[in-house]
Regions:
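Electropositive, glycine-dotted interaction segments
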Residues: 118-265
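C-terminal lobe/lid and adjacent interdomain/linker elements of RecA-like ASCE P-loop ATPase modules
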Residues: 1-4, 333-412
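Conserved ABC ATPase signature
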Residues: 48-54, 268-308, 312-326
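Pre-Walker A-like glycine/lysine-rich segment at the N-terminus of P-loop NTPase domains
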Residues: 2-68
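Conserved Walker B
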Residues: 10, 321-325, 354
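Phosphate-binding glycine-rich loops of NTP-binding sites
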Residues: 43-90, 300-301, 306
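Short alpha-helix of the ABC ATPase nucleotide-binding domain corresponding to the H-loop/switch region
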Residues: 327-332
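Short N-terminal edge-element motif at the start of the domain
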Residues: 75-101, 109-114, 123-124
Length: 412
């Protein structure tokens, strides 16, 4: 489960931004017993959160930052920042040495074994600047550092700008001596420099393996700049097909239309040719291909796969721009479904729909805003919990938001 995630200097976010998935420590959480998971490690972790903001405010950049971090774990190629992903206000020159190109990503999670992992990565346009990885066994326990790597020297080799020699200060502890010996031999590297934690996993460190697997398999980031249903329509992933054929998937799908009583999956084109079967009040059976059904049904059909992964596979899903399908009524059904099941999955989604601003279904810690500074155009991420004057008996959150009192609305 995700405990917290923060990042800095990514796209429209110049300063540090953070999402914290811990439930509040006060009595408020007792009003929402289904909204969080009480872990054996001493944490109360939220199951859901919503991020609200205007168009072009930075919601997608927030989710894309996590997608970028996740992509770092896919291979062992050199890791560095890209100018197109650095905050524009930190790029005052074409010369990297005269710009602030360093980006930072920090994430804390609970692995499947119950071990708590804390990972920090700092990169610039050249390569890794600093990387650390530690673990502990409980919320109150002391973190034990496994690896700390800091760039000491960087110099160019030959005529190609991309040919760099890097020397790192590396400290390894709390792992096998054999692993430590291997890493001491990589302190000076002339080739590709992947993540140190990934290398730890490759050589067999159990903690690194668990964390890397969590980043690759448990974390799901869906951030598409076009219709999600159309995106899924051009894919044919076996894992999606497996989920679609589960009886429990139909239970989720029926939230969009309770007249749906069955589906006939098309193995070749499951997101377009699958037949949706409905039953009328009179008992008549109607069948229609998904591509000929309403856009809302098609869109929810695609997103229902991710909801399945949250509830039945304990995945951490970040979903961007689900407004086309999650109207307030359907969103309430979906959140109630996720909260009502016993699991360790999490669902965080972004939305323009201010009707999600509801303290009947959410704690203040579950509602986040993204707003943009009118002068610098920098984005900021913050929680409704940052407004102590907002009480749980407040019914005017929508009104406060529309007046700009809570931020997150477009400026003139």
């Amino acid at each position: 489960m995700l405990i917290s995630y923060r990042f800095k200097n990514f796209c429209s976010f110049a300063e540090e931004a953070e999402i914290d998935m811990m439930a509040p420590g006060n009595k408020v959480k007792h009003r929402f017993p289904d909204n969080y998971v009480k872990t054996e490690e001493g944490y109360d972790i939220l199951k859901t959160a919503v991020v609200i903001g205007e168009n072009a405010g930075g919601k997608t950049n927030f989710i894309n930052s996590l997608s970028f971090l996740k992509s770092m774990f896919e291979d062992n190629k050199v890791k560095h920042s890209y100018r197109s992903l650095i905050n524009i206000n930190n790029l005052q020159s074409e010369c990297p040495a005269e710009c602030e190109t360093k980006q930072e990503f920090d994430i804390s999670v609970i692995g499947e074994s119950g071990t708590i992992y804390h990972y920090n990565l700092q990169i610039d346009e050249f390569c890794i600047v600093q990387e650390s990885f530690s673990f502990k066994q409980s919320k109150t326990g002391k973190e034990k550092k496994i690896i700390y790597a800091k760039r000491e020297h960087l110099k160019q080799i030959g005529d190609k700008p991309s040919s760099m020699a890097v020397e790192f200060e590396i400290k390894i502890d709390n792992c096998d001596k054999e692993i430590q010996t291997v890493f001491e031999q990589t302190a000076y590297n002339k080739g590709a420099m992947g993540l140190f934690v990934s290398k730890l996993a490759i050589v067999g460190d159990s903690h690194a393996i668990e964390f890397v697997n969590w980043m690759n398999d448990k974390l799901v980031v869906e951030s598409k700049n076009y219709n999600y249903y159309l995106y899924k329509n051009i894919q044919n992933e076996e894992d999606d097909l497996r989920i679609l054929k589960e009886d429990r998937f139909l239970e989720i799908l029926r939230m969009v239309d309770y007249s749906i009583c069955g589906i006939e999956i098309d193995d070749e084109k499951p997101f377009s040719m699958t037949k949706i079967i409905r039953k009328t009040k009179d008992g008549n059976i109607l069948s229609r291909e998904l591509r000929r059904d309403s856009g809302g049904v098609g869109e929810f059909f695609a997103w229902a796969v991710q909801i399945f992964r949250v509830v039945y596979e304990n995945k951490m899903v970040f979903a961007d721009e689900v407004d086309r399908v999650l109207n307030p009524i359907l969103a309430e059904r979906m959140i109630a479904f996720i909260n009502g099941k016993d699991h360790k999955g999490q669902f965080v989604f972004s939305s323009h729909n201010v009707l999600h601003l509801d303290l009947k279904n959410y704690m203040k810690e579950q509602i986040y805003f993204v707003t943009k500074n009118r002068d610098t155009l920098d984005s900021e991420l913050y929680s409704l919990a940052d407004f102590p004057e907002i009480k749980y008996d407040t019914t005017k959150i929508y009104e406060f938001y529309m007046k700009g009192i809570l931020g997150g609305t477009a400026f003139e």
